[in-house]
């Protein structure tokens, strides 16, 4: 090996050593507080080294990417669905589609176990599993004309597993959408500032869509500046309106009202043309997403804050107040999207491969965008770990866990305001005492002061992770840019997350509608027509109706639906990732590259162990701490049967809990059947092709890139 080659690797070796040293500090320092900077530097080093070496190994050895091969976008260039797109524009488009609420919420919830377990899983998971899955699916789909995950399973393994996979993907999509919507509802309930700001984004996006289409076509920079100025104005005026004696109470809505508004919004937006609301919303969201995360990272570099949360808390045994479940397997399910997420397999097949200009871009987009998303998750974990742990637990523990009943903040503007303020003080004192007794000392004054700082009546009962992240963002941005108060930055954070999530809700409902039309089209061919308005309305109504039902159940559930839906969301999401990795393994076997299947088999096996174990516990555990579905249902049925002095409301609440648990149990069993039947068919396929010495995969024939090169579009 010549010296030139060796010298080329020296900077990377140094970077690797720096990363390893920072990780060692994060992992091994005990008892003293350390700076959040260690985590940021360690993560960036890990991402860069993994991208430089591991993703290159996969691209060159496992996939053998071919720069001379024409992609589906080049072959079918129709200016509509198939468009060869600039790799940086496509990176932004793909990142906006995959980075929903998962990387924001999961890590915040996982912080109840301390910052260390989450950090290690986010780094190891993304390098070995998450980015591999995204890259693999994108590669396979781009060699099959941009086929969707279900279609590829049908082609490579047969029609039965194909239909099962389509059905499974659709079910998982419904759960993901319900969870995303629930997070928006929790963030906007009883918050007039949030409601005004988030509602303003709809006319802003519509205006941007019309501006780009008719007034000044193609002026992306111009319209983005206008959009951002209008966004900032809407945050500022939201604060003015929230403190207005008339408009404040008028825009304070209960969670059920917001639920119905969201369902209506999603239904309409999924039927509107893409250019009108979805595309401009994506632009706004991508600017905001990458801007805020980079801003947060720079803020942490400037402020060098210390991590207040311990490296590991006492809750690794599964007794935590936010969610139940021990470190293994539940940490690996709570943090889905930053480490590995099956939802991405639905984006990496279907949409993104139809826009790929050159096959070699798949590494940058498939592997690279997932690393970026993992960084978003790391920043969320850091934001949750630099605020006071006592405040973190007070905000995220459901009221029942704190032993309190929240007063009706709805009447804050009315004549009962003094009574409600007094009740709020009592409740806060009780909550502070409870959290302090767990070893995370906090005073009622600190909790009330935080609420006052951020311009909200209270910070209690703010589960779902979004408000905690917004407080973390507000802490950092307010210290770096003190001219705007904490309230502005907090609502900026909430808006950032709601936009993040609404983008996913819009896009998800739209692809959910296509999936449902695909499924139903097998029985009623007319419904397959995506350009028919009637079929579109039926598909959208079915999709929105299903996630809307789960969302409503979650909102009215006194135990907080996110608690029951979140583990299901994590488990189903990881199962879908396992299915995608099984497909990757089958394709490698059929391509006669069996020596490389460890790349997909190792993460697939790990995900299957985690998800099956977690589902087994959630279904059959009789440990009251675990809140197993069947156990909880039987407990509440018993309470209803034996309860003599129960009010009608209590009985209705208990019946809700019983229905929720049976729904979740039914869905869990369905997922197990879906995943294991696909593994069975994968195994069957392997047995069928193992003795053939020719390739048996269904790759489309090689077409060379046209001689004049490819005309690349820089906007999509």
From Swiss-Prot:
Transport is inhibited by the protonophores 2,4-dinitrophenol (DNP) and carbonyl cyanide m-chlorophenyl hydrazone (CCCP), but not by ionophores such as valinomycin, nonactin and nigericin. The chain crosses the membrane at residues 6-26, 31-51, 89-109, 120-140, 164-184, 192-212, 223-243, 258-278, 283-303, 327-347, 375-395, 485-505, 532-552, 569-589, 597-617, 669-689. The gene is btsT. It catalyses: pyruvate(out) + H(+)(out) = pyruvate(in) + H(+)(in). It comes from Escherichia coli (strain K12). The keyword Cell inner membrane applies. The keyword Transmembrane applies. This is Pyruvate/proton symporter BtsT. Optimum pH is 7.5. GO terms for biological process: cellular response to nutrient levels; cellular response to starvation; DNA damage response; plasma membrane pyruvate transport. One of its GO terms (molecular function) is symporter activity. Keywords: Cell inner membrane, Cell membrane, Membrane, Symport, Transmembrane, Transmembrane helix, Transport. Induction: Strongly induced at the onset of the stationary-growth phase. Expression is dependent on the BtsS/BtsR two-component regulatory system, and on cAMP and the cAMP receptor protein (CRP). Repressed by LeuO. Monocistronic operon. Regulated at post-transcriptional level by CsrA. Belongs to the peptide transporter carbon starvation (CstA) (TC 2.A.114) family.
